[in-house]
């Protein structure tokens, strides 16, 4: 009986977009890619290379070592590359900037008051955190996270938390510097006349300490983590889904 005939069709209820947990990338990986080499002189793929057959096969008659299927039945499998040093994802630089400006450089808590009576609104018993949390949730309910209104409220929180009145963290008492972005991906923290460069490892450590309940203030939900945008592992797509080129009358997947 073929593999296809045993598959049970399922209906997709929803698709949720978000950041991917590095541990999930490793978990779904069939092989760790450690070399950029593809094929040996004898035509066989290098083990742990970019064409390692554990990520799928494209030649008739060959079996994928991961699922023991031929190319027409095997969907292919992801691999992964473990980075020696973390790298900032350039597509999320603005998110990182917002997170660094809105949180404490020591305890990583949001620079908003948590005590009752600190709300800028009309409720005298409400905290500043509750005030902005309720406003953000209201915007999400009415307009969604992709709306202009959502961007505006997150920018408002960023402006408040990085203002001149937030030079000292209200949670731990640490002095706060000014976050500067030297494009494309270099962050610095300036204190008076001194300036400290934040390397990707520093940034990741800072972001990883932000409490889950404070992520809403930087425009994230608890199912994602900000440190995931500082990459430590890269997914390698299955061989079967990669674009191909013709080289010396042979089809080569890249």
Predicted regions and their residues:
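Conserved core architecture of multi-subunit DNA-directed RNA polymerases
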Residues: 1-252
């Amino acid at each position: 009986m073929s593999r296809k005939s045993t598959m049970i069709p399922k209906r997709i209820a929803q698709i949720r977009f978000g950041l991917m947990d590095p541990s999930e990338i490793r978990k779904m990986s069939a092989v760790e890619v450690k070399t950029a080499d593809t094929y040996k002189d004898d035509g066989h793929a290098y083990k742990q290379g970019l064409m390692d057959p554990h990520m799928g096969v494209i030649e008739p008659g060959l079996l994928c070592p991961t699922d023991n299927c031929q190319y027409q039945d095997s969907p292919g499998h992801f691999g992964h590359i473990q980075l020696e040093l973390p790298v900032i994802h350039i597509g999320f630089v603005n998110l990182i900037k917002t997170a660094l400006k809105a949180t404490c450089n020591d305890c990583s808590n949001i620079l908003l008051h948590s005590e009752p009576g600190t709300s800028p609104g009309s409720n005298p018993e409400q905290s500043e955190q509750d005030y902005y949390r309720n406003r953000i949730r209201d915007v999400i309910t009415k307009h969604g996270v992709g709306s202009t209104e959502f961007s505006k409220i997150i920018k408002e929180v960023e402006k408040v938390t990085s203002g001149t009145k937030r030079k000292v963290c209200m949670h731990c008492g640490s002095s706060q510097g000014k976050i500067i972005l030297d494009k494309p991906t270099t962050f610095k923290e300036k204190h008076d006349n001194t300036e400290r460069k934040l390397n990707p490892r520093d940034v990741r450590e800072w972001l990883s300490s932000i409490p889950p309940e404070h992520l809403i203030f930087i425009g994230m939900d608890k199912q994602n983590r900000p440190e995931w945008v500082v990459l430590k592992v890269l997914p390698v797509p299955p061989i079967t889904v990669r674009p191909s080129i013709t080289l010396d009358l042979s089809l080569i997947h890249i």
